[in-house]
C-alpha cells in the first residue's frame, strides 16, 4: 500500500500561483499543467484509483512548481 501524500489547499494554491508568476503566458502554463496531468493519468490508468497518493493535476502542479528553478524544463518540447 502506498503512503498518501497530503498537501493543504493553501500549499497547492501557492504553488500554482508561483507557476503562473514565473510563466510569461498564463494560458500556456495552464495547458502545460493539463497536458502533464493527462500524461500522468494515462500512465496510472492501470492502477487502482483509491491507491493513488495524489490526483494527476495536483501532482503536475507540485512537480512543475519544483521545476521553476530550472525554466528550461517548462519550455515547450
Swiss-Prot record:
It catalyses: RNA(n) + a ribonucleoside 5'-triphosphate = RNA(n+1) + diphosphate. It comes from the Bacteria. GO terms for cellular component: DNA-directed RNA polymerase complex. Keywords: DNA-directed RNA polymerase, Nucleotidyltransferase, Transcription, Transferase. InterPro entries: DNA-dir_RNA_pol_omega, Pol_omega/Rpo6/RPB6, RPB6/omega-like_sf. Its EC number is 2.7.7.6. GO terms for molecular function: DNA binding; DNA-directed RNA polymerase activity. It is an enzyme of class 2 (transferase). It holds the Pfam family RNA_pol_Rpb6. GO terms for biological process: DNA-templated transcription. In cyanobacteria the RNAP catalytic core is composed of 2 alpha, 1 beta, 1 beta', 1 gamma and 1 omega subunit. When a sigma factor is associated with the core the holoenzyme is formed, which can initiate transcription. Belongs to the RNA polymerase subunit omega family. Promotes RNA polymerase assembly. Latches the N- and C-terminal regions of the beta' subunit thereby facilitating its interaction with the beta and alpha subunits. This is DNA-directed RNA polymerase subunit omega. It comes from Thermosynechococcus vestitus (strain NIES-2133 / IAM M-273 / BP-1). The gene is rpoZ.
Amino acid at each position: 500500500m502506498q503512503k498518501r501524500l497530503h498537501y493543504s489547499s493553501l500549499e497547492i494554491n501557492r504553488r500554482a500561483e508561483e507557476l503562473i508568476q514565473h510563466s510569461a503566458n498564463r494560458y500556456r502554463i495552464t495547458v502545460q499543467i493539463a497536458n502533464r496531468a493527462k500524461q500522468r493519468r494515462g500512465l496510472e490508468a492501470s492502477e487502482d484509483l483509491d491507491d493513488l497518493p495524489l490526483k494527476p493535476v495536483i501532482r503536475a502542479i507540485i512537480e512543475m512548481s519544483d521545476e521553476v528553478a530550472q525554466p528550461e524544463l517548462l519550455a515547450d518540447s
